[in-house]
Amino acid sequence: GPLTNIAALVLARPDLAGRIDDLTWMGGGAGTGNHTASAEFNAWADPEAVAIVLAHDLPLRMVDLEFCRKILCRPEEAERLRTLGGAHADLMADLFGGFIGIATRRGRPAMAFYDPAAAAAFVHPDLVTFEPVGITMELAGTATRGRTVVERRSHYMPFNAEIAAEA
């Protein structure tokens, strides 16, 4: 979600913020947005919070839209969970099925697993290749407010975050 709570912590209790050793965020995008043409929803919802987090050198790992859109789940994969048997497998199959249903009702064959992809990257960072980047938060643009501008060339700006590159 938006980084509002983390930004509030940084401003109110910088002593505690300094104890954060891994901040994995499902948000932002190196390309087009999903809420506006430029902005991913979680970045758009509170771009000032993202700017605060970036300005305070927290160890940010951004799991962005482009990465999440590669992590797809199809109806048959959700049903395969059910074959494992048991209440937990049935619950997960039902949850995944409902989530996938959002995509299929919109004519898509599969659903991108946005938040689950970020959760997996946090719990098992060995499953994801992260690369260092420089991120700037667009705060002023009329059409670009909320855009995370991702720079992969270190000679243009210092790297201040990492972005999920491959799973």
Task: Locate predicted features.
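Conformational coupling and interaction surfaces
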Residues: 44-48, 63-167
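Active-site histidine-anchored catalytic micro-motif
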Residues: 2-75
